[in-house]
């Protein structure tokens, strides 16, 4: 009798659940440890400078700890600003790509386009960074920035002289190119998942191809929002490529042609020197903590919208 009861109990146990639970636990513990690591290392700087660490724009390293003054407003702004530019560029490109691949591309061209997009999404960032520094920046400076500055400098966005071309605009455009394949993959899959009955119904009602596409784009709006939010989160964390094209200067400005900093580029450029100063290392950990929290919030929102879309499609 006992043997039969044990067998029945074993049948009810989900072996895969038992196997996967430790992995989930390990991932959760790693998440907590990383967050705790950043918080405790950032604590000395937060205790010393308080809220001013995040709302002021200053970077004065000194051998005497009492003379050290730091403020992360410019890098925080730079991260959000360049990521926003990137998303504005990725939005039309990724939607057009998804529509073309699903509705217009010949069968022989469809698969190569998907493969190329996936390859671009997986390229090392240094590849984009070198290309951006030596090709994209001179191209933008000589043919776009100078033209906009000469003819439209009365607009505040364009009234900063584009001396080197290494600026917020260059970083934003490069990031836009980098995250477009990522956003496009999500939007492409969402567009492909639209039930054929919707397309057939629209055609039966006499809708043109343009009108059909317009309606279908509205149908996948949650997936588009999700893809762009996740692309924004990815753009926030890009380091090497941005460091090579943004100019690395503490400018708290909305002027597109001004050099700037992002949190990632600040950490990459200053971490090697941080050990020479009392508080700089802790300040950089504070910057990393800010990036961690922003990225976490952005990704949670993006995943929420993606989940909503999947639930909508399943029903």
UniProtKB/Swiss-Prot annotation:
Q: Which Gene3D superfamilies match?
A: MetI-like
Keywords, A to Z, come to: Cell membrane, Membrane, Phosphate transport, Transmembrane, Transmembrane helix, Transport
Q: Which PROSITE patterns match?
A: ABC_TM1 (PS50928)
State its location(s): Cell membrane
**CDD domains xrefs:** TM_PBP2
Assign the protein's first listed, main location to one coarse class: membrane
Protein's UniProt keywords contain Isomerase = no
* InterPro entries listed in its UniProt record: MetI-like (IPR000515), MetI-like_sf (IPR035906), Phosphate_PstC (IPR011864), Phosphate_Transport_Permease (IPR051124)
* Statement: the UniProt record of this protein carries the keyword Heme: no
GO-annotated biological processes:
phosphate ion transmembrane transport
Q: What residue stretches are annotated with the ABC transmembrane type-1 domain?
A: 76-302
One GO CC term, this protein: plasma membrane
Q: Which residues form a coiled coil?
A: none
Which molecular function GO terms apply here?
A: phosphate transmembrane transporter activity
Residues spanning the membrane:
18-38, 80-100, 119-139, 167-187, 227-247, 283-303
How the protein sits in the membrane? Answer: Multi-pass membrane protein
Q: Which Pfam families match?
A: BPD_transp_1 (PF00528)
Can you tell me which family this protein belongs to? Belongs to the binding-protein-dependent transport system permease family. CysTW subfamily.
The entry's function note states: Part of the binding-protein-dependent transport system for phosphate; probably responsible for the translocation of the substrate across the membrane.
Specify the protein name: Probable phosphate transport system permease protein PstC
